[in-house]
Amino acid sequence: MRTLCTLLCALLAGTVSVAAHHSFAAEYDGEKPVTVTGVVARIDWMNPHIYFYVDVKDDKGGVTQWKFEGYPPNMLVRQGWKRDATMKVGDTVKVFGWRARVNPTQAAGRDVTFADGKKLNCGPPAGTGGQ
């Protein structure tokens, strides 16, 4: 009985960390949609999620780098992405997503629209913000 109780406690403790890792609301604000257009500066195609960075110019010519979190690589492939072909450093993109709660230039990506008009999903839906 004691072994069973220990095993159940260990399993439950593991599920808490998994749930915390996948808590959109803990890191992002579904009430604050954002759309930015800029040039892809870097792509980190890795598990558990990809990250891509977009340099966005303001009206005065200053550049701010936005960090976007996307789906895991295997989910992006199912959405039509190809690791070295879909999005490349230097591409101009428009990204829609939801702002991070803490970092004002970080967001959870939802959709990426490319210069040729092609639009691909890059992350889950969240919040009430529409596009």
Task: Locate predicted features.
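Short aromatic-glycine-enriched beta-strand elements
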Residues: 46-57
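Short nucleic-acid-contacting surface segments enriched for D/E, G, S/T with interspersed K/R
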Residues: 78-95
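Short, basic/aromatic beta-hairpin or loop at an interaction surface
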Residues: 62-74
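Bacterial N-terminal signal peptides
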Residues: 5-17
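Glycine- and charge-enriched low-complexity intrinsically disordered segments
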Residues: 128-131
